[in-house]
């Protein structure tokens, strides 16, 4: 797995925040977002922003934002039922990987193991996120960028 430290800009987004087990909330959130995006003919980067450590937080307390990036000046119409937010920029530990058979858990575990081998960076309190480069919703196979927020030790 090839990894690097990258500097990412802040990214504005529209999307849905859901709470509960990620294997349920991520597909649900993207289904909602896909419908909303189709009605508004928007284009952007599809991402999932994760809140909570699944090794210590019970599944029902995990949160995810399923989002599409938008320009900074994007304005939502009142009553749309969708949220608008900003993903913080800064340093991130990055990899581009292929997930097979929807096994995101193994991909994240391997990615975190790579970061733990480094002594010069540590995880900070911003959320981890995925940027999808392909739609694997039918096949279960995904190409994506994964990002872990970091700060120097």
Curated annotation (Swiss-Prot):
Keywords assigned by UniProt? Cytoplasm, Stress response
* Location within or outside the cell: Cytoplasm
What's the chief localization of this chain? cytoplasm
Q: Which family does it belong to?
A: Belongs to the DNA gyrase inhibitor family.
Complex and partners: Interacts with DNA gyrase.
Functionally, this protein is described as follows: Inhibits the supercoiling activity of DNA gyrase. Acts by inhibiting DNA gyrase at an early step, prior to (or at the step of) binding of DNA by the gyrase. It protects cells against toxins that target DNA gyrase, by inhibiting activity of these toxins and reducing the formation of lethal double-strand breaks in the cell.
UniProt protein name: DNA gyrase inhibitor
Encoding gene (name):
sbmC
């Amino acid at each position: 797995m090839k990894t690097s430290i990258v500097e990412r800009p802040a990214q504005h987004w529209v999307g849905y925040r859901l709470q509960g087990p990620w294997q349920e909330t991520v597909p649900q959130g993207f289904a909602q977002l896909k419908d909303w995006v189709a009605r508004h003919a928007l284009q952007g980067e599809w991402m999932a922003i994760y809140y909570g450590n699944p090794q210590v937080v019970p599944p029902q307390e995990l949160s995810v934002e399923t989002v599409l990036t938008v320009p900074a000046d994007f304005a939502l119409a009142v009553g749309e039922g969708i949220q608008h937010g900003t993903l913080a920029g800064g340093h991130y530990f990055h990899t581009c990987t292929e997930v097979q058979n929807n096994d995101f858990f193994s991909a994240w575990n391997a990615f975190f193991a790579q970061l733990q081998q480094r002594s010069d960076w540590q995880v900070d309190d911003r959320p981890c996120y995925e940027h999808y480069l392909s739609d694997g919703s039918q096949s279960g196979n995904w190409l994506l960028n994964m990002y872990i927020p970091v700060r120097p030790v």
